């Protein structure tokens, strides 16, 4: 109960942040599909059966902001309850739990590369809480399944995009694909975009890693 109260207090603090002008145009919340990311299976020490956070990226309309000036990542302490919450939403799949929670390599990388670029709006803890809050509002796996897109099946770019747009107020997501097997395009990540205040969805700039033609089927790896 005490842990839940602490987490609730974190979110109350996040919502009470004073508005400040942003130096970026929108956020992209990037969610990774573990079955694709972890292929072949020995690539990951741990994995999830649902989408997990890759990062929350402040972006300009024409380019991504990276490695901005500011204080570098400070590791969260073991007794800090945010680690337990991050472990559920932002899994460091390439590392075992002990190493991941102690060294925090993915969280450090993402904050130093992207999070610092929105420091005028969100400090380190607020940045991570924001990413988790945004993910909590989405259930992309259920959304895809509702539209017949289930793990192990293939669909066109348009079919996947149309399904995701039903939960983004019709704003384009950024579908990100890889070829783990030559000639087989598969869905690796989904980017969902928001205004700097994270109060509304926004349109994502396409990264153009997927074949968007109607003749190509994209694998949603099972």
Curated annotation (Swiss-Prot):
Coiled coil: none annotated. Keywords: Disulfide bond, Endonuclease, Glycoprotein, Hydrolase, Lyase, Nuclease, Secreted, Signal. GO terms for molecular function: ribonuclease T2 activity; RNA binding. Disulfide bonds join 38-44, 68-117, 177-210, 193-204. Residues 1-22 form the signal peptide. It catalyses: a ribonucleotidyl-ribonucleotide-RNA + H2O = a 3'-end 3'-phospho-ribonucleotide-RNA + a 5'-end dephospho-ribonucleoside-RNA + H(+). One of its GO terms (biological process) is RNA catabolic process. Its main location: secreted. SUPFAM superfamilies: Ribonuclease Rh-like. The keyword Signal applies. The active site is at residues 54, 110, 114. GO terms for cellular component: extracellular region. Glycans are attached at residue 50. RNA binds at residues 54, 92-93, 109-110, 113-114. Its EC number is 4.6.1.19. It comes from the Eukaryota. It is found in: Secreted, Extracellular space. Self-incompatibility (SI) is the inherited ability of a flowering plant to prevent self-fertilization by discriminating between self and non-self pollen during pollination. In many species, self-incompatibility is controlled by the single, multiallelic locus S. PANTHER family: RIBONUCLEASE S-2 (PTHR11240:SF81), RIBONUCLEASE T2 (PTHR11240). Belongs to the RNase T2 family. This is Ribonuclease S-3. It comes from Petunia hybrida. The gene is S3.
